[in-house]
Amino acid sequence: MSSQGKVPVGIVGASGYGGVQLVRLLVDHPHLELAYLGGEGSAGRPYTDLYPHLQGCVDLLVEPVDLEAIAARCAVVFLALPNGLAVDLAPTLLQRGCRVLDLSADYRFSELKTYTLWYGKERQDQAVAATAVYGLPELYRDRIAEAQLIGCPGCYPTASLLALSPLMKQGLIVPETAIIDAKSGTSGGGRQGKINLLLAEAEGSLGAYNVGHHRHTPEIEQICSDLAGHEVMVQFTPHLIPMPRGILATVYATLRDPGLEREDLLTIYRAFYRNSPWVKILPSGTYPQTKWACGTNLCYIGIEVDSRTGRVIVMSAIDNLLKGQSGQAVQCLNLMMGWEETLGLPQLAFYP
C-alpha cells in the first residue's frame, strides 16, 4: 500500500490508446495510485510529452521495462502490450506477488494450441496460462474475484458475447446459425500509423476486413462453447467505420422456439443481467447507439424478433476503449480487490 493507503498500480505499454485510457481511469480511482508507467519506445520521456493534455495530472516518466523494479513498486500491473509480449512478463510478475491484468490476447484461451493457431506464437507458459481467468465480469464474476491473472477480453468479443450469452446459456437458439455483424471505430486499430486508418482513407467509407478469419472469432467461439456446453462455431464479420471510438454488434440467430416474442426475450435478458450494473437492457422497440456508450463502461442492448424468419436480432453498443478494453480491466480489478465493480468507472457518456 502507498503512504495514502492506496493500492500502487503500474502500466506496461502506457503509450497506446489502451494505456492512456487506463491512466485516465486510474488517476480518478479513489483506491488506486499510479506508481509506474513503462514502455521501451518512449522510455525516459515524460508521459505528458506523449499526451500533453495530461499536464498537471500525471508527472511520471515512461520507464524501461524492469520486472524487478515494477514488482517492488506495484501490487497490480496492467499489461497493455501487443499480442505475444505478455507471456514473457506475466510469469515473473506473478511470482513476485503482483496481480496481473493482460489486455492482449495472450491469456484469453483455455487451449494454448488455439492461441498458437491464430496468433502464431508457440507457448512455454502452460502452467501460468492455466491459472488465467477470462475477464468478462458478467459471466465469470466469482472466478475473477479469486484470480491473480486476468485475460481481459477483446473489444469485439465483449460486445458480441454480451449480446449472445443469454441465448447460448439458456439454449434459446440454434447455435450454429449465429451470425455477428460488428462495426468498430478506428481507435480499435491502435495508435500506430496505418494507411487504412488515415483520415483521407477512412472518412466517408465503410468496409469489412479479415472476413472469415478475424482473430477474435475463436475467442467468441470458446466462450459460446462454454455457455452452450458443447462446441459452437459462429460467423463473425468486423467492419471499420469512420469514427474514433465505439462498437455496434448486431447478432442474428434462429430461435429454437419460433413462438418466442420480443417481450419474452426482454424478460430473459433483464433476469440474466439483473446483477450486472454495466449492462443496460433497453425498452421494447429501442435500439442502442454507440454515442450513448461513448466514454463509459456501459453496454447497451436492444432486442428484436422477426417472426417472419424465426430469428432473434440482438444489438449491443459499447465504447471499444472502455467496456471493450481498459474500463473492463478496471472493473475486473475492482472485483479482485473486493470493491464495488462500479468504483472509479464513468457512467455518463460524452454527449452529443
Curated annotation (Swiss-Prot):
PROSITE patterns documented for this protein: ARGC
Family matches, as SUPFAM superfamilies: Glyceraldehyde-3-phosphate dehydrogenase-like, C-terminal domain, NAD(P)-binding Rossmann-fold domains
GO MF annotations in UniProt: N-acetyl-gamma-glutamyl-phosphate reductase activity; NAD binding; NADP+ binding
Protein localization: Cytoplasm
Family matches, as Pfam families: Semialdhyde_dh (PF01118), Semialdhyde_dhC_1 (PF22698)
Main localization category: cytoplasm
Presence of the UniProt keyword Kinase in the record: no
Source organism, top-level taxon: Bacteria
Enzyme class: oxidoreductase
Family membership noted in the UniProt record: Belongs to the NAGSA dehydrogenase family. Type 1 subfamily.
Role, per record: Catalyzes the NADPH-dependent reduction of N-acetyl-5-glutamyl phosphate to yield N-acetyl-L-glutamate 5-semialdehyde.
Name of the protein described by the UniProt record: N-acetyl-gamma-glutamyl-phosphate reductase
Organism of provenance: Cyanothece sp. (strain PCC 7425 / ATCC 29141)
Gene transcribed to yield this protein: argC
